[in-house]
Swiss-Prot record:
Residues 1-175, 220-263, 373-400, 864-887, 945-961, 1016-1020 are cytoplasmic. It is found in: Membrane. The gene is ACA10. SMART domains: Cation_ATPase_N. This is Calcium-transporting ATPase 10, plasma membrane-type. It is a multi-pass membrane protein. Its main location: membrane. The chain crosses the membrane at residues 176-196, 199-219, 264-284, 352-372, 401-421, 843-863, 888-907, 924-944, 962-982, 995-1015. It comes from Oryza sativa subsp. japonica (Rice). The N-terminus contains an autoinhibitory calmodulin-binding domain, which binds calmodulin in a calcium-dependent fashion. The active site is at D456 (4-aspartylphosphate intermediate). This magnesium-dependent enzyme catalyzes the hydrolysis of ATP coupled with the translocation of calcium from the cytosol out of the cell, into the endoplasmic reticulum, or into organelles. Pfam families: CaATP_NAI, Cation_ATPase, Cation_ATPase_C, Cation_ATPase_N, E1-E2_ATPase, Hydrolase. Gene3D superfamilies: 1.20.5.170, Calcium-transporting ATPase, cytoplasmic domain N, Calcium-transporting ATPase, cytoplasmic transduction domain A, Calcium-transporting ATPase, transmembrane domain, HAD superfamily/HAD-like. One of its GO terms (molecular function) is P-type calcium transporter activity.
Length: 1020
């Protein structure tokens, strides 16, 4: 079966499946009782096609708009323009001078002509009653007016479907519709023959069973849909930096309004349409909106920023002009919200299993109907009444047909793929509480098979709370882990050195020091920037004063490829100065001079360079991150178009930044090792820092290898194949190195790879990995969008929790499959064999519907929601080539099925003598005992299925309230059904002895199951 499934249903991958593969597997699902329900959570490929068409149209629209705008600009250069725009009265009344439609046409149409007629960006800001420096006012009445005129930054989403929609969908099950028709005919014929109410019992019994199945199914599906809706809302929560009332603050993108001033950096998503106010080296990736991969330069000449696009490089301040559904992104999102998620590989395989068993069930159902009908016809023939049919005969034939249809209901295990959805929804909800947000269903499933985790160091293995603890300035090494030490260092250094150092830190930064509403200093920026700015403040520096002294001419922000950040300043006395900071070895290699202890600039000879490199190494050996700062004097005529020089710098000093290892990381790494998961550290830091941290975390072992990115890049393919299995630490790595490592691990070594990432440049590796894990705090929006799971607390221990939940989902579904296939096999065999050999079926349509509900919805609820236990992390991972339906499962299924079938067959043939049954009700009593015993066999088999290999199946059962609730409700309802609903369920109240016997026959299944588990099975 496994090879058939792989061949026919294995084309769908956990990530990046082709559309052809997604369409193909659905066509292969031959027997589907309710397509609407079965395929509810699968991707809507038609909607995706619509989204692609919108992207293509956007691309064409933007291309035309830019061409028209350029042509118009050629005509209006130098002309004095007067706006002919008329402000609508309601906009004027609200205190604004421009309407939403006009703003939309300017930005979306890239209309430079209109922008100039409105006075450029500052003119638009005035008309929006806002300030490019201080942002808009937060007065409640002002915000309300703005919302009324321009709308909210929210997109139209598909409405939450009501409970009754799910009821209607559950009713569209083909087999239930056929049974409903049978019930209707049964009611009509029964009432005509026996009158009301006696003649209605059989028909009403089927109707009641159908309604019960429908309502339980609809309730389960409705709860799942609400869970997915909640998770979808979590995915869309994005915070941005905004200036309002002159103060910087973080705000949800849903609270943004036209007139807001937003600050963007590398990796951010543009939250709404708007205009560029100021910034440096801004490159925008518009592929999410237009499909065009070439980045666009945005500056004063091309100031248009479109919602949904991403900052690829640089930083800027933007003015929001258009929000929500008025933007192209809003329209695209409304379409994509109906696109759905791809079906996971496990769901697809289980659809295959359901199809195979469904076809077998259909075959047996037809044979059963033929055999039962043949028995009736044969009886009529022998009685000479073949042409004389009564209402009773019609009802009997109808009952045979209903039994055949119900065999299909039981035999087609549609609960299998739906159990995956139920289990994943349950796990995703619980993982949210454990600080992990699953973006793609398949990731939760794939994480259970992970064999390797490639983890970042900073913020994942470490706390990301950084402080400068050591500094080497002018050759003077000093501990600066408290304000007094920093003050002492400042007094020991020449004034010119302190001035240059503060100028470097305060200007060459992506961070900012602001005063909050309480009048206190607040440092904004990455943890590294924050540590440096805190250090500069402790030296007595004033951020605003230093920034006001000079003017920034050009800035090149830090990224993980260049590993440095540079800025060119225009000095107050004339001339320019470039400042550079970054990875110590790289910046020091760019220096040919240094500042000595007197503050004099002297040539950097080999001896001094070696000494400084030794200091870098000693800092790194103490697990400190090191940064080197340098500057270079330049000519006054430096132009923005010129490249900032890469050489000729003067070394100011080196700082050592402490980033402590997170508590619990060492234990989590040990847990991974015992679970057969190899943890590798991939970092941009110095190799000595990386090795020190890796040893502290327990990642780097005696036989492990630590390698630098540049060395890794130079290796030949043959050398890489020998090295990669041993690599535990990769330092000074570029995003491309990470991508190469992941690709080789996946393709050459067949590993299932999880990768963490936080930066924009990590997106390719996150995309390539089987499971991409983005950091929720330090991660950029680009990284989060490329990821499958977002680690909300940036903690490595959470990644281990995700792996544990992934394994739990996988094992829970295996348990459910084992349980359901057992019920399938036994129900099929009992009714088929009985029909063939005795001419009647002991399990009626109503009873089989009840069994189907125990098996499908309640069984899935009980077994697929079992929480994870620590034992899951003591077994080897399934890996890429592991079989889903294992030999252990086949052993348990066949063993338990054999026991149950023997019990049912014995009751069928010897039950009357065993219980001393005679008289007119003997047949009904026996069939009730068979039904009751069959249900209790499933109840105890459900308990046995909690463990596939272990004997102790009761461990932790009292903590699983869902499981206990399902078992209790099953037993209670079974009692009511047998004792009180006999007219509807074709049962008769049983004696105490008969109840004890039924329960005991089910209970014996547990020790039988334990004995079966002792039987050894091979791996093939």
């Amino acid at each position: 079966m496994e090879s058939y499934l792989e061949e026919n249903f294995g084309g769908v991958k956990a990530k990046n499946s082709s559309e052809e593969a997604l369409r193909r597997w659905r066509k292969l699902c031959g027997v589907v009782k309710n397509p609407k329900r079965r395929f509810r959570f699968t991707a809507n490929l038609d909607k995706r096609g619509e989204a692609q068409a919108i992207k293509h149209a956007n691309h064409e629209k933007l291309r035309v708009a830019v061409l028209v705008s350029k042509a118009a600009l050629q005509f209006i250069q130098g002309l004095s323009l007067r706006s002919e725009y008329v402000v609508p009265e309601e906009v004027k009344a609200a205190g604004f001078q421009i309407c939403a439609d006009e703003l939309g046409s300017i930005v979306e149409g890239h209309d430079s002509k209109k922008l100039i007629t409105h006075g450029g960006v500052t003119g638009i800001a005035d008309k929006l009653a806002t300030s490019p420096a201080d942002g808009l006012s937060t007065a409640e009445e002002s915000i309300k007016r703005r919302q009324d005129v321009y709308g909210l930054n929210k997109f139209t989403e598909s409405e939450v479907r009501s409970f009754w929609v799910f009821v209607w969908e559950a009713l569209q099950d083909t087999t239930l519709i056929i049974l409903a028709v049978c019930a209707f005919v049964s009611l009509v014929v029964g009432i005509a023959m026996e009158g009301w109410p006696k003649g209605a019992h059989d028909g009403l019994g089927i109707v009641a069973s159908i309604l019960l199945v429908v309502f339980v199914t609809a309730t389960s599906d409705y709860r799942q849909s609400l869970q997915f809706k909640d998770l979808d809302k979590e995915k869309k929560k994005i915070q941005v930096q905004v200036t309002r009332n002159g103060f910087r603050q973080r705000l949800s993108i849903y609270d943004l309004l036209p007139g807001d001033v937003v600050h963007l950096a590398i990796g951010d998503q543009v939250p709404a349409d708007g205009l560029f106010i100021s910034g440096f080296s801004l490159l925008i990736n518009e592929s999410s909106l237009t499909g065009e991969s070439e980045p666009v330069v945005v500056n004063e000449d091309n100031p248009f920023l479109l919602s949904g696009t991403k900052v690829q490089d640089g930083s800027c301040k933007m003015l929001i002009t258009t929000v929500g559904m008025r933007t192209q992104w809003g329209k695209l999102m409304a379409t994509l919200s109906e696109g759905g998620d791809d079906e996971t590989p496990l769901q697809v395989k289980l659809n295959g299993v359901a199809t195979i068993i469904g076809k077998i069930g259909l075959f047996f159902a037809v044979i059963t109907f033929i055999v039962l009908s043949q028995g009736l016809i044969s009886k009529k023939y022998h009685e000479g009444l073949l042409l004389s049919w009564s209402g009773d005969d019609a009802l009997e034939m109808l009952e045979h047909f209903a039994i055949a249809v119900t065999i299909v209901v039981v035999a087609v295990p549609e609960g299998l793929p739906l159990a995956v959805t139920l289990s994943l929804a349950f796990a995703m909800k619980k993982m949210m509480n454990d600080k992990a947000l699953v973006r793609h269903l398949a990731a939760c499933e794939t994480m259970g098979s992970a064999t390797t985790i490639c983890s970042d160091k900073t913020g994942t293995l470490t706390t990301n709370h950084m402080t400068v603890v050591k500094a080497c300035i002018c050759g003077n090494i000093k501990e600066v882990n408290n304000p007094k030490n920093a003050s002492d260092l400042c007094s020991e250094l020449p004034e010119t050195v302190v001035k240059t150092l503060l100028e470097s830190i305060f200007n060459n930064t992506g961070g900012e020091v602001v005063i909050d509403q309480d009048g206190k200093y607040q440092i904004l920026g990455t943890p590294t920037e924050t540590a440096l700015l805190e250090f500069a403040l402790s030296l007595g520096g004033n951020f605003k004063a230093k920034r006001d002294e000079t003017k920034i001419v050009k800035m090149e922000p830090f990224n993980s490829t260049k590993k440095r950040m540079c800025v060119v300043l225009k000095l107050p006395g004339g001339g320019c100065r470039a400042h550079c900071k970054g990875a110590s070895e790289i910046v020091l290699a760019a220096c040919d001079k240094f500042m000595d202890e007197t503050g004099a600039v002297v040539p950097l000879d080999k001896t001094t360079a070696d000494k400084l490199n030794g200091i870098i190494e000693s800092f790194a050996n103490e697990a400190l991150r090191t940064l080197c700062l340098g500057y270079r004097e330049m000519e006054e005529g430096f132009s923005v178009e010129e490249q900032i020089p890469l050489q000729g710098y003067t070394c100011i000093g080196i700082v050592g930044i402490k980033d402590p290892v997170r508590p619990g990381v060492r234990e989590s790494v040990a847990t991974c090792r015992s679970a057969g998961i190899m943890v590798r550290m991939v970092t941009g830091d110095n190799i000595n820092t990386a090795k020190a941290i890796a040893r502290e975390c327990g990642i780097l072992t005696e036989d492990g290898l630590a390698i630098e990115g540049p060395e890794f890049r130079e290796k030949s393919l043959d050398e890489l194949l020998k090295l990669i299995p041993k690599i535990q630490v990769m330092a000074r790595s570029s995003p491309l190195d990470k991508h190469t490592l992941v690709k080789h691990l996946r393709t050459t070594f067949n590993e299932v790879v999880a990768v963490t990432g936080d930066g924009t440049n990590d997106a390719p590796a996150l995309h390539e990995a089987d499971i991409g894990l983005a950091m929720g705090i330090a991660g950029t929006e680009v990284a989060k969008e490329s990821a499958d799971v977002i680690i909300l607390d940036d903690n490595f221990s959470t990644i281990v929790t995700v792996a544990k939940w992934g394994r739990s989902v996988y094992v829970n579904i295996q348990k459910f499959v084992q349980f359901q296939l057992t019920v399938n096999v036994v129900a099929l065999l009992v009714n088929f064999s009985s029909a063939c050999f005795t001419g009647n079926a002991p399990l009626t349509a109503v009873q089989l519907l009840w069994v189907n509900m125990i098996m499908d919805t309640l069984g899935a609820l009980a077994l697929a929601t079992e929480p994870p236990n620590d034992d899951l992390m003591k077994r080897e991972p399934v890996g890429r080539t592991g079989k889903f339906i294992t030999n252990v499962m086949w052993r348990n299924i066949l063993g338990q099925s054999f026991y149950q079938f023997i019990v049912m067959w014995y009751l069928q043939t010897q039950g009357k003598s065993m219980f001393g049954l005679d008289g007119p009700d003997a047949e009904v009593v026996l069939n009730t005992i068979i039904f009751n015993s069959f249900v209790f066999c499933q109840v105890f088999n459900e308990i046995s299925s909690r463990e596939m290999e272990k004997i102790n199946v009761l461990r932790g059962i009292l903590k699983n309230y869902v499981f206990l609730g399902v078992l209790t409700s099953t037993v209670v309802f079974q009692f009511i059904m047998v004792q009180f609903l006999g007219e509807f369920a074709n049962t008769i109240p049983l004696t105490r002895l008969q109840w004890i016997a039924s329960v005991l026959l089910g209970l014996i299944g547990m020790p039988i199951s334990a004995i079966i588990k002792l039987l050894p099975v091979g791996s093939s």
